[in-house]
């Protein structure tokens, strides 16, 4: 299989977040809520169900402290995730706070697009530099069948508006499923031919609540990869702060294709990201442990040195790879709880 070159990208600070396997971490995925208003059949088919005990999500000041600590340790990119992060009433304040943190160069947002048409201008003003939005189908009825919401046309208008106000590229996520997404591949290719969209197909991942759905719908991204390579698409080099997608481009297309294939051998070798949940727990892997509590060190600015020390110490416990290939998805019942 064709290998992907990785660009040697310099940084202003040398990251101190380096694990036992010499992987460097410059990318934080920060969940600010686990609430989601969609009912996607691959994630929350029965909708969001609040826990019996009340949860207090990270406050703006706690978010400021955790992002500052990561930035001080070399993190350059923060992705704000959920659940659906834009459901928080203080989302714009959070985005602005993250964007104003010294050392943070990119503030990305992962969203279901529910409020994109209405609020995209405000997101940009708050400091959101990059957007990933989910579009699992370009067919209105199919989209509603997958997500439980009749919002496709509004989301597409939101994407168009993003280009109008100066976003140079939008990343669009679709979960790769035999019955739903795979038959629409040609339609997606037509859509991105003249639009600077990176269309990212994410392999369906097995989680505790979705075993039977996974067995029925899982499709390897390699099948898509081989087809694209045969049609003249070419793999592109990756920058240090890039996510896990293998990106392909074609001279006849303005858009790109990204493939996220967690079951592929060596998927974890280039891991560059850590996760903090909306409840203030550090997760070293999407499919991993219960999480390491950080919240007791987020109350005061004077705790930053202790917080950074805990982050560095915890990182040494990060495993070399996940165990998805043997059916072990860790404790993860669904991906909404930590933002994927």
Swiss-Prot record:
The keyword Transmembrane helix does not apply. Disulfide bonds: none annotated. The keyword Lyase applies. PROSITE patterns: MOAA_NIFB_PQQE, RADICAL_SAM. Its EC number is 4.1.99.22. It holds the Pfam family Radical_SAM. Its cofactor is [4Fe-4S] cluster. [4Fe-4S] cluster 2 binds at residues 268, 271, 285. GO terms for molecular function: 4 iron, 4 sulfur cluster binding; cyclic pyranopterin monophosphate synthase activity; GTP 3',8'-cyclase activity; GTP binding; metal ion binding; S-adenosyl-L-methionine binding. Residues 20-246 form the Radical SAM core domain. S-adenosyl-L-methionine binds at residues 42, 83, 134, 205. [4Fe-4S] cluster 1 binds at residues 36, 40, 43. Belongs to the radical SAM superfamily. MoaA family. PANTHER family: GTP 3',8-CYCLASE (PTHR22960:SF28), MOLYBDOPTERIN COFACTOR SYNTHESIS PROTEIN A (PTHR22960). Monomer and homodimer. This is GTP 3',8-cyclase. It comes from Actinobacillus pleuropneumoniae serotype 3 (strain JL03). The gene is moaA.
């Amino acid at each position: 299989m064709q290998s992907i070159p990785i660009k040697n990208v310099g940084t202003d600070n040398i990251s101190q977040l380096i694990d036992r396997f010499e992987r460097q971490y410059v990318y934080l995925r920060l969940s600010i809520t686990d609430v989601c208003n969609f009912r996607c059949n691959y994630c929350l088919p029965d909708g969001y169900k609040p826990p019996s005990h009340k949860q207090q999500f990270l406050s703006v000041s706690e978010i400021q402290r955790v992002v500052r600590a990561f930035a001080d340790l070399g993190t350059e990119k923060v992705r704000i995730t959920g659940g659906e992060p834009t459901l928080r009433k203080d989302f714009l304040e959070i985005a602005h706070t993250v964007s104003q943190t010294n050392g943070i160069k990119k503030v990305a947002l992962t969203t279901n697009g529910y409020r994109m048409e209405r609020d995209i201008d405000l997101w940009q003003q708050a400091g959101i530099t990059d957007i990933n939005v989910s579009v699992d189908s370009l067919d209105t009825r199919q989209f509603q069948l997958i997500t439980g919401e009749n919002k496709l046309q509004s989301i597409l208008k939101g994407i168009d508006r993003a280009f109008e106000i100066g976003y140079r590229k939008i990343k669009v996520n679709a979960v790769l499923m035999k019955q739903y997404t795979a038959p629409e591949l040609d339609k997606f290719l037509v859509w991105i031919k003249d639009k600077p969209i990176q269309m990212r197909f994410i392999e369906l991942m097995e989680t505790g609540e979705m075993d039977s759905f996974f067995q029925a719908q899982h499709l390897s991204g390699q099948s898509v990869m081989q087809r694209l390579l045969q049609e003249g698409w070419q793999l592109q080099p990756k920058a240090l702060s890039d996510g896990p997608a293998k990106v392909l481009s074609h001279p006849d297309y303005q858009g790109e294709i990204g493939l996220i294939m967690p079951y592929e051998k060596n998927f974890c070798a280039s891991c560059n990201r850590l996760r903090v949940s909306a409840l203030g727990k550090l997760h070293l892997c999407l499919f991993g442990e219960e999480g390491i509590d950080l919240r007791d060190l987020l109350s005061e600015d004077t705790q930053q040195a202790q917080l950074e020390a805990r982050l560095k110490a915890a990182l040494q416990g990060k495993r070399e790879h996940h165990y998805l290939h043997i059916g072990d998805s860790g404790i993860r019942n669904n991906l909404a709880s930590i933002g994927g």
